[in-house]
Amino acid sequence: MPPSVTSFTALDALTHAIEAFVSTKANAMSDFYAKEAISCISKNIETVFEHPNNIEARQQLLIGSFYAGIAFSNSSTNLAHATGRALGVKFHMPHGQCVALMHPFVIQYSLESAYERYEEIAKIIGLNGTHFLSGYLDELNRKQHIWKSAQQMAPLLTDEVIEQLAEQALSGNGILTNRKVPSNEEIEVIFKQLRKRLQIEGGIVEWQQCQVEK
């Protein structure tokens, strides 16, 4: 399997699980499978990235992906998928890549409205607090060259294109299931944060570097 396919699908599965858990439609069944999925995927995703022939880790990743599918089928995804779909349609990019690009910024936007749930996710992954969650996803993206793979898109993300992307995102599924329902302008800010992140080459990124004026 090409490394990019592993990366895109694994990060999409992790997003399925996280979004299912923070969805406004979350329930006992989706919560159970979402937490199991987050645990399975987070424990094995980097092993699979670093050792692609590790069949046991791949099996655990597959099980986690299956659990994540059950979870979001019962509670839905939200803003990372809404914005990711818009990005994919506009630039003809793989779905998993687009969702991975958007997810860190969506968590930053939604954090306060679902703090306790994000806190539980951080604990499952083994992070020392919710404020590390976006950085954890950013680092996964960096290791798998997700940011680098989309850098050529940065100059194409003009303000006009971002307006179109925001409208497209608002017209699809995943808006009302987000704990914090975004306005058109707030989605534009999220896309501008993505643009700014893609303009930063290499190194560890401090999240304040990606902030833009609202």
Roles of regions detected by a PLM:
Residues 68-99, 172-174:
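Glycine-rich phosphate/pyrophosphate-binding beta-alpha loops
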Residues 1-75, 185:
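Carboxylate- and glycine-rich phosphate/diphosphate-binding segment that chelates Mg2+/Mn2+
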Residues 86-128:
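Catalytic phosphate/nucleotide-handling subdomain of diverse soluble enzymes
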Residues 126-214:
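C-terminal charged capping/lid subdomain of soluble metabolic enzymes
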Residues 32-36, 60-63, 82-85, 101, ...:
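Amphipathic alpha-helical interaction segments
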Residues 42-43, 80-82, 114-118, 141-148, ...:
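Short acidic (Asp/Glu) and glycine-rich catalytic loops that position anionic groups and cofactors
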